[in-house]
């Protein structure tokens, strides 16, 4: 009888151990990641005793089919930043400071070089978010995933003090401000890939100065941790919404009270080139608004009297913004988000 082994079924324990060793080398070089316990059964984190009435807040997310763009471009250095960003940007909406992050990588066949690029991005994202990479899991799934493909999931825990869920005091005429995104972030890529496939588009085609389509699509998701937490602490903003899958249309209502609705002026939008390029293939305005962030990765709501403080704070973080609308009484409008004007898709 032929002897069977785990490696003969397509899973290499030795390669997995080597990958963990490579990650440990990276971790040891970075003093900011000293809390990490890569290779252990679990990770531990000591909560700061100075935090009054601590409440732990958790978030989990992935990066969708943006991974396929990274694979097509053979560039996996920033996809890990996206993974961290998608989780921490959700946490900060609820005023939680990111504490630690864990990752999960699933692949048909482990490629150590590719894996190091992915982990390198995750580490960079954690540093940008001021949180620890506490651990993770890398799994080979032969015959389930194809050899050159992989998927990612991230898990982040943060902390805040006070009540578990306080409803913000939103009022009519409060200002709605869009904070600029770096691009598509990590949503809408299935539609983008359909456009690329059906139109036989080459990712090395230049559409913006010296930037190719592939480079614009791979721009890592903006991490808003520092500016948003700063503005919450200084009571500059009342609430915010992370604009992900579902676009402004689906995400902004999640941060609104039942007594108010959002009125958005599309004429105020400054659309980056990549969104104009996508729309040029016949994507309607409504579809754009409920699929993509359309240039604003985070939307904040504030009292008009706080505008000067907001401008000073956001400029110190070198982020661009636009006042895109205001809140109205829900009795005056039958939608949680209504739009006036049209997006300018022309150059």
Model-inferred region functions:
Residues 2-9, 25, 114-132, 145-152, ...:
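Glycine-/charge-enriched secondary-structure boundary and capping motifs
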Residues 7-13, 28-32:
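N-terminal basic, low-complexity leaders that serve as flexible interaction/assembly modules and, when applicable
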Residues 20, 51, 64, 140, ...:
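Residue-level detector of flexible, active-site-proximal loop/helix-junction positions
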Residues 151, 164-209, 249-252:
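Short, acidic (Asp/Glu-rich) active-site segment that either coordinates a divalent metal cofactor
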Residues 49, 105-106, 183, 247, ...:
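Short, glycine/serine-rich, charged loops/turns that create anion-binding
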Residues 27-182:
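Glycine-rich phosphate/pyrophosphate-binding loop regions near the starts of catalytic domains
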């Amino acid at each position: 009888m032929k002897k069977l082994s785990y490696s003969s079924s397509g899973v290499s324990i030795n390669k997995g151990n080597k990958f963990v060793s490579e990650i440990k080398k990276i971790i040891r070089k970075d003093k900011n990641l000293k809390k990490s316990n890569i290779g252990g059964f679990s990770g531990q984190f000591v909560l700061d005793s100075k935090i009054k009435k601590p409440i732990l807040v958790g978030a989990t997310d992935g990066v969708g089919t943006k991974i396929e763009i990274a694979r097509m471009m053979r560039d996996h250095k920033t996809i890990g930043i996206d993974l961290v960003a998608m989780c921490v940007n959700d946490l900060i909406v609820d005023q939680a400071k990111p504490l630690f992050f864990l990752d999960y990588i699933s692949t048909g066949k482990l490629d150590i070089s590719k894996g190091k690029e992915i982990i390198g991005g995750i580490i960079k994202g954690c540093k940008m978010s001021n949180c620890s990479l506490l651990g993770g899991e890398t799994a080979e799934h032969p015959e389930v995933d194809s050899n050159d493909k992989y998927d990612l999931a991230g898990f982040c825990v943060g902390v805040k003090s006070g009540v578990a869920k306080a409803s913000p005091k939103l009022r009519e005429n409060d200002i709605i401000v869009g904070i600029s995104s770096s691009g598509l972030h990590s949503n809408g890529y299935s539609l983008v890939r359909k456009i690329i496939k059906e139109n036989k588009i080459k990712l090395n085609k230049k559409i913006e100065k010296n930037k190719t389509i592939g480079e614009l699509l791979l721009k890592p998701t903006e991490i808003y941790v520092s500016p948003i937490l700063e503005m919450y602490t200084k009571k500059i903003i009342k609430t915010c919404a992370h604009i992900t899958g579902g676009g402004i249309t689906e995400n902004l209502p999640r941060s609104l009270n039942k007594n108010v609705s959002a009125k958005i002026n599309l004429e105020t939008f400054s659309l980056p080139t990549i969104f104009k390029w996508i729309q040029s293939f016949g994507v309607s305005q409504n579809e754009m608004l409920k699929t993509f962030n359309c240039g604003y990765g985070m939307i904040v709501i504030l009292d008009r009297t706080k505008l000067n403080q907001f401008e000073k704070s956001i400029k110190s973080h070198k982020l661009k913004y636009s006042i895109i609308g205001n809140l109205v009484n829900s009795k005056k409008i039958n939608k949680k988000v209504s739009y006036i004007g049209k997006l300018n898709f022309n150059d």
